[in-house]
């Protein structure tokens, strides 16, 4: 059974790891018995001395200096044995770590080789993609492979066309199988190239445009088509008439403002006329001959001197403003001026005289003065 390159490298790394773990133990096992033998020999030689034949004790024969030297030698022998035992133990600790690092390095090299092998290995021909998997991404490597296939098919088609030319006589050499194979390859390549251009964010409109029409497709429903009525173009639109007089009329706010201004002017003029009433009463006794008739339009007709005074007062701007206010008030309040003036003409006493003096000075009858006179 043939092993692949990856399996061989893994097996070799396992062997190296096992050896690195077992060798230190073997060295340590050999060093311990040798150290024990050396230590026992020293203690036996130092402990068993020949007994003296004389009656002297053994301790008295050797001085104390010799005993100290013997003890130091014994300690040095044991220390040397211990030092020899520590060296194999350090080696046993370092070798497994070193072997583990080698194993990691081998695995890293294997990973690199496997990744390179995947990139360089030629992939099989792409199968036609289903309609539901249109959004599949195509790598650059696949696109390069498709371009190479396109070049090959173009060259093959050029050869076929050159053989099938009018001047060529070798038309029988080209088989129909080759033509069908080339056509199938071209169809597959064009389909995959189109799918490669499709991105993840494709819109359904583009999908509908690129999707081929099915055999049982009957077209869009009639509801999607807009209803076109040519008679609408011939119809004439109705004209709209706008009343311009309504546009020129003042609004209610403008009318209210005008009425407010008129009332203010009337109040100012009324205060001035009330101050002049004593003068009017004094002039009644001296000017009893001044008589006038009131026309239907509100004008006072009298003597020549009165007419001249009326003309002077008509030129006064204050009188003009008061006349304008009187006209606006008379238009808003629908009252008959003739009846009010006739009632005032029938009255007697100083009120009639004051009315005559007012007529002489102002030249027109103000509604304000009539209201003040009535009460």
UniProtKB/Swiss-Prot annotation:
InterPro entries tied to this protein: Ric3, RIC3_N
Which residue intervals make up region (Disordered)? 38-63, 251-375
Lumenal-side segments:
30-90
Q: Do the record's keywords include Methyltransferase? A: no
- The annotated regions of Basic residues compositional bias extend over 365-375
Give the membrane topology: Single-pass membrane protein
Q: Which residues lie on this side of the membrane: Cytoplasmic?
A: 112-375
Q: Membrane spanning segments where?
A: 91-111
**UniProt feature, compositional bias: Acidic residues:** 305-319
Q: Where are stretches of biased composition, namely Polar residues?
A: 38-47, 286-296
Q: Does the keyword Cell membrane apply?
A: no
Q: Which UniProt keywords apply?
A: Chaperone, Coiled coil, Endoplasmic reticulum, Membrane, Signal, Transmembrane, Transmembrane helix
Top-rank taxon, per record: Eukaryota
- Cellular compartments per GO CC: endoplasmic reticulum membrane
**Which residues belong to the signal peptide in this entry?**
1-29
Q: Which regions form coiled coils?
A: 135-165
* An example Gene Ontology biological process: positive regulation of protein localization to cell surface
List locations, semicolon-separated: Endoplasmic reticulum membrane
Q: Which family does it belong to?
A: Belongs to the ric-3 family.
Q: What does this protein do?
A: Molecular chaperone which facilitates proper subunit assembly andsurface trafficking of alpha-7 (CHRNA7) and alpha-8 (CHRNA8) nicotinic acetylcholine receptors. May also promote functional expression of homomeric serotoninergic 5-HT3 receptors, and of heteromeric acetylcholine receptors.
**What is the name of this protein?**
Protein RIC-3
